[in-house]
UniProtKB/Swiss-Prot annotation:
Keywords: ATP-binding, Cell shape, Cell wall biogenesis/degradation, Cytoplasm, Ligase, Magnesium, Manganese, Metal-binding, Nucleotide-binding, Peptidoglycan synthesis. Cell wall formation. The gene is ddl. SUPFAM superfamilies: Glutathione synthetase ATP-binding domain-like, PreATP-grasp domain. ATP binds at residues 167-222. Gene3D superfamilies: 3.40.50.20, ATP-grasp fold, A domain, ATP-grasp fold, B domain. It is found in: Cytoplasm. Coiled coil: none annotated. Pathway: Cell wall biogenesis; peptidoglycan biosynthesis. Its EC number is 6.3.2.4. Its main location: cytoplasm. This is D-alanine--D-alanine ligase. Mg(2+) 2 binds at residues 314, 316. One of its GO terms (biological process) is cell wall organization.
Length: 364
């Protein structure tokens, strides 16, 4: 029997999605095969400090993993002298939001010379920015909701003018979103000017740039994409899932996702005709390729029920792995069990790492 791979499970973080990470990490820990991997849980608290845990101490934590316990050991940092502070071959990041999904963490791990699960620096950075992701995803004619951007540099007068312009151009309701955040953190539905002003002010608490977009009447559709293990093979796409929100918020808000999820239905497979289903799968695969994604991504769309027009919403290059998260659920429904999915992602990460290690870096 081969020696288990030393694997860091990294979770927590300085992010508005900190709590989501703790739940995702508990689910991943539960499904990782301890005979294949020597699992080293490392948590980052909201101040950016790292804490090492013993795997066996966390086995009873079924709902979410703790950040600090009486038995956890503080680390000076994730890296020491440019290398991981612990002896590990690979890092499985289960962290969300800025610094973790936008290429920063990925670049740090590449500098440390360690393998990591998921998209690389480039695709993470593009995928995290809703504006840039839409520009590339829609390069060949795919639609997205019309939107406008606002920077936190804008003064009060400029913000007020911006709000009047988007309301006049797009009408009500409007959606306000931080440009580089996920899990519906900081997202608001605005039905009037007072709500829009409040939503803009709140969203700018989470990000330096926000977008305000028109409301698309349609079904919320999600697909999971997995890189092909065959070199140059087409991305693998799961069956299609649909999110049906019955929550009073009226959209897939943070509350509807995580706090009151019983009021949201995850429908797998989505009831679509064959032609529309194939169009969505092809669009998801294309977007994965356009953004040069590695490992995994979840691609989200809106579909107009009457016209069957497809609108790209966003791509998530480090999707949630909670028990209710669509990415693992879609693959389970497609025939890929949760533990097998984790194995596949880890194997893909090792392949990319080995490739990077063989690149020439000395030109003399």
């Amino acid at each position: 029997m081969s020696k288990p791979v030393n694997l860091v499970l990294l979770y927590g973080g300085k992010s508005g999605e900190h709590e989501v990470s703790l739940v995702s990490a508990a689910s991943v820990l539960k499904h990782l095969d301890s005979e294949k991997y020597h699992i080293i849980p490392i948590a980052m608290d909201k101040s950016g400090r790292f804490h090492r845990h013993d795997y066996n101490d966390l086995l009873a934590c079924s709902d979410k993993l703790p950040v600090v316990t009486e038995k956890s050991t503080p680390l000076e940092g994730l890296l020491i002298n440019g290398r991981l502070a612990v002896d590990a071959e690979i890092v499985f990041p289960v962290v969300h939001g800025p610094l973790y999904e936008d290429g920063c963490l990925q670049g740090l791990l590449e500098l440390a010379g360690v393998a990591y699960v998921g998209c690389d620096v480039l695709s993470s950075a593009i995928g995290m920015d809703k504006d840039m992701a839409r520009r590339l995803a829609c390069i060949n004619g795919l639609k997205s909701a019309r939107y406008k951007l606002l920077s936190w540099h804008a003064n009060a007068s400029e913000r007020q003018q911006f709000c009047h312009e988007v309301a006049s151009e797009f009408g009500w309701p409007l959606f306000v979103k931080p440009c580089s955040l996920g899990s519906s953190v900081g997202i608001h539905k605005a039905n009037n000017m007072d709500e829009l002003n409040a939503a803009v002010a709140d969203a700018l608490r989470y990000d330096e740039e926000i977008l305000v977009e028109e409301f698309i009447v349609g079904r919320e559709i999600e697909l999971a994409v997995l890189e092909n293990s065959i070199p140059c093979g087409k991305p693998r796409v799961s069956m299609v899932g649909e999110i049906k929100v019955n929550h009073p918020d009226g959209y897939y808000s943070y509350t509807a996702k995580y706090l009151e999820s019983s009021q949201t239905d995850l429908i797998i497979p989505a009831q679509l005709n064959n032609s529309l289903e194939e169009q969505l799968k092809q669009a998801a695969a294309n977007i994965f390729s356009y953004l040069k994604c590695k490992g995994m991504a979840r691609v989200d769309f809106f579909v107009n029920d009457k016209t069957e027009e497809i609108y790209f919403n966003e791509i998530n290059t480090l999707p949630g792995f909670t028990s209710i998260s669509m990415y693992p659920k879609l693959w389970q429904a497609t025939g890929v069990a949760y533990p097998d999915l984790l194995d596949e992602l880890i194997n893909l990460a090792m392949v990319h790492h080995n490739c990077r290690q063989h690149l020439v870096t000395n030109y003399l």
